[in-house]
Amino acid sequence: MKKEGVDVLVVIGGDGTLTSARDFARKGVNVIGVPKTIDNDLASTDVTFGFNTAIDVVTEALDRLHTTAESHHRIMLCEVMGRNAGWIALESGIA
C-alpha cells in the first residue's frame, strides 16, 4: 500500500472488517477504524451505525406478519440478526 502512496487506511465496519484493519496495522499500515454494527453491542455508545435502520426494517416486517397472523389466527415467530446481543429483538418488539 505504501508503494501506491496510501498514507492511511480508513475502514468502517463490524468485527470482520476491524479484525482485518488490525492485521494491516500490525504490518505497519496507519489505520483508522470506525465501528459499524447493526447489533448495537459496542461499549460506551448508546446506538451504533446501522441499528436504527435494522429496527425500521424489522418493525415493518413484523407489522406485515402481524396482519397475516391475525387474519389466519396463527402465531408467528420472527428471528432477527444480532449475533450474541438481543437489542434488535428487544427494540423491534417494543416498537
State each model region's role.
Residues 87:
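Conserved SGNH/GDSL esterase-like catalytic core that processes O-acyl groups on lipids
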Residues 94:
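ATP/pyrophosphate-binding catalytic subdomain of soluble kinases
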Residues 22, 90-91:
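Alpha-helical segments flanking ligand/cofactor-binding loops in enzyme cores
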Residues 1-79, 83-84:
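Active-site histidine-anchored catalytic micro-motif
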